[in-house]
Regions:
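Structural recognition of the beta-strand scaffold that forms the well-ordered cores
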Residues: 261, 291, 300-302
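Extracellular/oxidizing-compartment recognition motifs
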Residues: 1-194, 202-203, 219-222, 239-244, ...
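The substrate-binding groove and active-site-proximal loops of carbohydrate-active enzymes
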Residues: 163, 212, 244-251, 267-277
């Protein structure tokens, strides 16, 4: 709600006499240390392909399934609500398809203050969306030039490319490239759009190798290996999702095996031995845990959960 904005509060001459004074509080838990990798940023901008009027709203096609947000030129009167609803597909009648989002709202709402300078734009700061299509409502006379699509991903070099004479293969590679960059969000997540967006280990057990052909993912996977290690239980069990926002400690082999496989990839592709050295105690502890609880006298592991799903 732009009507509640504080104005130029970042400037030295801002009158903050009505602010509450700062208070001393307890330090947060956790370990204070330098960030291991760059953060997310806007790495590319796209122009919308089309905007079609549909009743009292508009449907915008960005031309590409991506992760990021839409920046728009602010229009309207004070109190007007501009609403952007994001989706990856359209229904047969041209409406946006949102069933795959489950209970994720995937919506940005901006309330016009009436004080915005001419030509001012707005985009969200604390959320990203996975989308190609956008349903726009509350926006007067929407035109493509009023909107800019901003692609958001972890800041890292794009180091590889591929092209051949087969158009289908080229498109498969292009789809993979966009899928990977859309899921690099401080860690490799499983999707950028629905109500999940979780760093599942198994999805990247082998995926990390192919990803490194196109992205310099050295720092990110080194950081994620630490996340996995720090999510390990005292008994050696490694979760299926790390950081363990979802409490999935199912004691299988294929998903936790991602930790040694990441370390192997970082050594093989980048010549970096440190992840192996740093994570070896955790890997050894996990192997000992599996051997103690789930290995028969014939060296057969009797426990698993997901099988070859997503691997």
């Amino acid at each position: 709600d732009a009507r509640k904005e504080l104005g130029n509060w970042t400037q030295t001459d801002y009158d903050d006499t009505k602010w509450m004074p700062a208070e001393r509080v307890s330090i947060p838990s956790g370990t204070l240390r330098a960030q291991m990798m760059p953060g997310m940023k806007v790495t590319e901008t796209l122009k919308p392909v089309s905007i079609q009027k549909m009743g009292d709203k508009y449907i915008m096609d960005t031309g590409q399934n991506l992760a990021g947000w839409v920046r728009f030129r602010i229009k309207g009167q004070a109190g007007d609500s501009i609403r952007l609803h994001f989706a990856e597909r359209l229904e047969s009648d041209g409406e946006i398809f949102t069933k795959n989002l489950r209970d994720a709202h995937c919506t940005d709402i901006y309330v016009v203050s009436g004080r915005e300078p001419q030509g001012a734009t707005w985009a969200p700061r604390f959320v990203y969306h996975g989308f190609r299509y956008v349903e726009i409502s509350g926006y007067p006379d929407a035109k493509t030039e009023d909107f800019v699509v901003e692609v958001v991903e972890d800041e890292m070099d794009h180091t590889g490319s591929f092209s051949c004479s087969d158009k289908t293969l080229n498109q498969v590679v292009r789809n993979a490239f966009w899928g990977i960059r859309s899921n690099y969000k401080g860690m490799p997540v499983d999707c950028p759009q629905r109500n999940e967006r979780q760093p599942w280990l198994g999805d990247h057990a082998m995926g990390c190798w192919g990803e490194s052909m196109f992205f310099d993912n050295h720092a990110m996977y080194n950081k994620w290996a630490r996340d996995i290690r720090e999510a390990q239980r005292e008994d050696g069990c490694i979760p299926d999702v790390a950081p363990a926002y979802w409490n999935y400690y199912s004691d299988n082999v294929t998903w936790p095996a991602t930790l040694p496989l990441i370390c192997d990839m970082l050594f093989t592709n980048y010549g970096d031995m440190r992840p192996i050295e740093d994570n070896y105690p955790a890997i050894k502890k996990w192997v000992s845990h599996i051997r103690e609880y789930y290995m028969t006298k014939d060296y057969i592991i009797t426990k698993d959960k997901y099988g070859d799903w997503c691997v």
